[in-house]
Swiss-Prot record:
Role according to the record: Tautomerization of D-dopachrome with decarboxylation to give 5,6-dihydroxyindole (DHI).
Source species: Xenopus tropicalis
Entries under InterPro entries matching the protein: Macrophage_inhib_fac (IPR001398), Tautomerase/MIF_sf (IPR014347)
This enzyme's EC code(s): 4.1.1.84
GO biological process: melanin biosynthetic process
Name of the protein: D-dopachrome decarboxylase
Lineage: Eukaryota, Metazoa, Chordata, Craniata, Vertebrata
Gene: ddt
């Protein structure tokens, strides 16, 4: 069950209206997870500084159980997420940051329990 959070200082009118939907589909493909298990949040107009500059930028946080735990996995994921973000947001790679956070099943709650017991 991947959780993807995208923060950007771009105003809403400069972000494609369907970005959340596209990011959901891209995440499902990149992480080899069913689309219906992917959770996406997009926040626009956020006050942000990346690399000492408040020029247009974005940060993407990807957390998931089992698929973001190694450098090798994340290197592959990073290349694909960077391609998606540069193509869909019009940002240069030096204005994009990614963070990968591996989760354990006991850290994700669903249906009044945690994933360990589902």
């Amino acid at each position: 069950m991947p959780f993807v959070e995208l923060d950007t200082n771009l105003p809403p009118q400069q972000v494609p209206q369907d970005l959340a939907e596209k990011l959901c589909s891209a995440t499902a493909t990149i992480l080899s997870k069913p689309r219906e298990r992917v959770n996406v949040t997009v926040r626009t107009g956020v006050s942000m500084v990346v690399g000492g500059s408040c020029a247009p930028c974005t940060q993407l946080l990807v957390s998931s159980i089992g698929v973001v735990g190694t450098a090798e996995q994340n290197k592959e994921h990073s290349a694909k997420f960077f391609q998606f973000l540069t193509e869909n947001m019009g940002l240069e790679q030096d204005r994009i940051l990614l963070r990968f956070v591996p989760l354990e099943p006991w850290q994700v709650g669903k249906k009044a329990t945690v994933m360990t017991f589902l």
